Design a protein with these regions (language model features):
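Secretory/organelle targeting and membrane-embedding segments
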Residues: 1-152, 156-490
Length: 490
């Protein structure tokens, strides 16, 4: 753990903060938010911070502290010393949601008395979608809008009309610059490394276009099922749950033009240009699937048409990407849990190589980003096998974050995003314009979705996904040598 006060200047927020954590006893708060706030506080990122928990549970302050300590003991990835816990516990307060806006207003006022000078408020709404607007209105009734920012969890609507309506309701209370729509995928270090990789190196950006790139895959299969989210998942499905809020945001990082600076406004504008250039999604370019047994699970309609799997092809119609297909895939109960982006380069002429040389036998050259927490980047290419004759093997160059001395400096996704929200940095957050633009492009799919196709749990989805990507192949599971360079050529 980084000693308090050792954080580089400018990394933390400018002002002390009161964090109002709505849904403070829920699953996300226990797994990610409370451990994240503990680490940010004790590591010196937010040395002046008070946290007010709010939930439907009828607790007092000591009861909430027990919940918080249990969350740290079960889910914290860092050591929790008694001294650090005592300091963190002293910063906690609690207000039952049933106590109303006036009780919350009083608790925030008490917390702010601990600070000298100006302070700010961060409201984190870790609540179900149907409760978000009522919480926003409660914050308005409590006069907690001024000097505040609000963080919201997905989904941000379920189609264009609902997204427009949601944003209009939010803007009745908060200004757009106060609203932070969270995407924890973009908070992960590997996702942020995409921007550094592209724009800090002269090697790849000149070939980052349709002249050199054949296609791009963004592949996020999950082995997990629904867990406790059956009721929520049944109303949204894989497209609304994962593609709009996560995969399209990653696509924007991959496809955007260089911003004028790595600041929130220029980056958001370039992302929105990508969304504006996206062609409407054709239902014929989409495969929807549902794993066998889904309809028999508790809380699921026995005749459900909700997809637990989706694969699609989309296009960005601009000078950089016209004609280059982007293939996206995600789903529940699949063969592996992975998060990769794979860029397939155009293949060179092959006739100069003799028959049997192996040229092209293992697919095109690939640049692959592994978005797991280990943060790997791999470049695969052909090279000559030692010995007589011209025999080619697929070789690989790899980089992994754990190979550097900085792996201990990595913030978890929610930690980074909380810190950014406190600083007013929208770089890794989604705007109202971006969300509404994506729902507009998705309208043809939402209006006329293709039928769901069954697939076996533990598989890679319905077999028809291979027709979707033909004549190419999915990077997973067919080309695996890039994952372990020590096995290459064997």
């Amino acid at each position: 753990m980084r000693p308090a006060g050792k954080v580089a200047r400018g990394v933390g927020p400018r002002y002390p903060h009161v964090v109002v954590l709505v849904g403070a006893t829920g699953d996300l708060a226990r797994r990610k938010l409370l451990p994240g706030l503990f680490h940010l506080s004790r590591a010196g990122f937010i040395p002046e911070c008070r946290i007010i928990g709010v939930s439907l549970d009828d607790l007092d302050v000591e009861g909430f502290r027990k919940v918080a300590r249990g969350a740290l003991d079960e889910f914290s990835t860092r050591e929790v010393s008694e001294a650090d816990w005592a300091a963190f516990a002293a910063a906690l307060d609690y207000v039952p949601l049933t106590a109303g806006a006036s009780a919350l207003q009083a608790a925030v006022a008490r917390a702010e008395k601990n600070f000298t000078g100006e302070s700010r408020r961060l409201h984190y709404l870790s609540v179900p979608p149907n409760a978000a607007l009522s919480c926003v209105r409660m914050l308005g009734q409590a006069n907690l809008v001024e000097k505040s920012r609000v963080v919201m969890e997905k989904p941000f609507g379920t189609d264009l009309p609902s997204a427009v309506s949601l944003n209009a309701s939010l803007h009745e209370v908060f200004k757009e610059e106060q609203i932070f729509r969270i995407d924890h995928f973009l908070g992960k270090e590997p996702a942020q490394n995409i921007l550094a990789f592209r724009f800090a190196n002269g090697l790849f950006e000149p070939i980052w276009n349709r002249n050199f790139i054949d296609h791009i895959q963004i592949d996020v299969p999950e082995t997990l099922g629904l867990g406790k989210r059956a009721g929520f998942y049944e109303t949204v499905g894989a497209f609304r749950d994962m593609v709009v809020t996560h995969l399209f945001q990653i696509l924007a990082f991959m496809a955007m033009e260089p911003p004028t600076s790595l600041e929130p406004t220029p980056i958001s504008e370039e992302k929105n240009k990508v969304f504006r250039s996206m062609l409407p999604i054709k239902p014929a370019d989409v495969v929807r699937g549902q794993y066998t047994g889904y309809r028999t699970e508790e809380g699921i309609n026995p005749e459900s048409d909700t997809e637990t799997f989706i694969a699609l092809k989309c296009f960005i119609d601009n000078w950089r990407w016209a004609g280059v297909p982007f293939y996206l895939r995600t789903g529940k109960r699949l063969a592996e849990g992975q998060r990769i982006i794979s860029i397939a380069f155009r293949e060179p002429p092959k006739t100069m190589f003799p028959p049997g040389s192996g040229i092209g036998a293992q697919g095109p050259d690939h640049l692959t980003f592994d978005l797991a927490d280990a943060s790997k980047v791999s470049l695969s290419f052909y090279g000559k096998r030692p010995g007589p004759g011209m025999r080619l093997d697929k070789l690989s160059l790899q980089f992994a974050m754990h190979d550097t001395g900085f792996i201990g400096d990595v913030l978890e996704a929610y930690e980074r995003l909380i810190l950014d929200a406190m600083r007013g940095d929208h770089t890794l957050y989604t705007t109202a314009e971006g969300i509404e633009g994506l729902w507009e492009k998705a309208a043809p799919l939402i209006d006329a979705p293709p039928p769901v196709r069954p697939y076996a749990p533990g598989s890679w989805g319905p077999n028809v996904i291979h027709q979707l990507i033909a004549p190419h192949a999915w990077r997973l599971p067919f080309e695996r040598a890039w994952r372990d360079p020590n096995r290459l050529g064997s």
